Amino acid sequence: MTREEPGADGSPWDPVVSRILARTSHPADVRHMTERWLTLRLANSQIYQPIHEVKEYVSFRVIVPGNLMGLATTTDLSEGGIKTLVDSAEAMARSSQEPVALTAFPGPGHEEVHETGLAAVDLGQIAESAARSAAEALGTVAREFPTSRVAGVYNAGQVTLSVGNSSGRHRAVTRNIYQGSLLVEDLSVDPPVSGWAEGASSDPHGVSLPEIAHRALERIPRRKVSPLPPGSYDVVFGAPAIAELMNMLSMGGLGAFSVEEGSSFLSEWRDRETIAPHLTLWEDPQDAHGLPEPMDYDGLPTLRRKLFDHGVARGPAHDLLTAARVGVPSTGNALPPEAPYGQLGPVPRHVTFEPGTASHEELLTRLGRGILVTRLHYVRFVHRQRTIVTGMTRDGTYWVENGKVHHPVANLRMTESILGILRRTESTGRDLLCCADERGVFAPVVPEILTRGVAFSSATSF
């Protein structure tokens, strides 16, 4: 769930934002972030003590004469801390050598405001509920696999972002985020056979650890791991694997920074057919399957727009700074300007597939013979402009024979073009899954897909 609120009568409702803006006479904006989290971890089939975390900080940007910008952040919200924050940002701006194209921040907006009756998160109650849910999940696994080992995590949080600027724009959004994942290993064989499942939702009932445990268990074949030689294989990619690839594509090719520096595939392929024509991908910040987030860190609405329209690549994501440099409107994709996100620039964080029609079983039937890859990790770029990445399969890599999962296979290193995978995609699953990181920053909503001729460059024995 999300709640978005404007300031009352155009005045800042957030006193922290007001206090900071009152200390400068220059164009400026403020982001005030408050986060409350519960994290429950599982290891060796045991529940670890829940961790409660509360964070509050602000970041401040200012433009001084000469169009020079400075940025500072702090967790000290005292008067002294705020004075230091503003002084530091203004000093940084005056020492900057590179003017920005942005001359002023946007004024009050007239966007539709969505009220969803978002309730405050009671972390104490959630901790009790999560512990019961985790115990039930562990019991489910123990009954199915008495010699199993379970690890995982459950996160629940409420995040409020308030953005205000010197031009009179004041917006805030509150989000509830629930995320969970489980790794199940069958220790009766050596090396252990593993299964993985995950999920994320803005609804507390949308992430159930027992249901995640069931999904992790249902595909584990009770056979020993067999090695598989490197080569080209037909593959059904699970949603977690596709989510990892979409996050890489977003960071490496769908943002304005990568277009500016010439490392994005969009430099050559914009408005051309780039992936399979039956695929349409959106940036959809309001998709109910995902983690709705109606505004960005500039305080602007994140636009619902097509990233690929029936295979044709569209334009990159923009924030205020990159949009000003090329004279186009922002798409509402600003990330926090401070590290570690500032170096990424604006990127889509809610990549959403239009669903296909195939069930999981139908995808395996169409695959016939090949590999089911549930998950990828350690994915890194080899050639950014060609979207070539390399990464390892992990936790749920199975050989499929005659359309059925037959046995687990040792992990493989995939070296492939992300666009090539999407270009050779033959079928798309009908079921969509939100696969978010633990804090809900990136939250793609993706299906399983069937792709032909995926290159695996090396293999392991485990």
What are these language model-derived features?
Residues 110, 269-462:
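Dual-mode signal for accessory low-complexity, basic/Gly-rich regions
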Residues 40-44, 158-176, 192-198, 245-251, ...:
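Short acidic, glycine/serine/threonine-rich loops at helix termini
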Residues 52-64, 171-199, 307-309, 395-402:
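Short beta-strand elements
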Residues 22-58, 150-171, 368-393:
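Structured beta-strand/loop patches that form or line metal/cofactor-binding pockets in enzymes
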Residues 255-276:
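Amphipathic alpha-helical
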Residues 18-20, 47-51, 125, 137-144, ...:
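A generic local secondary-structure boundary/capping motif
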Residues 38-94:
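N-terminal alpha-helical targeting/anchoring segments
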Residues 2-7, 11-17, 24-39, 84-173, ...:
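Acidic low-complexity segments
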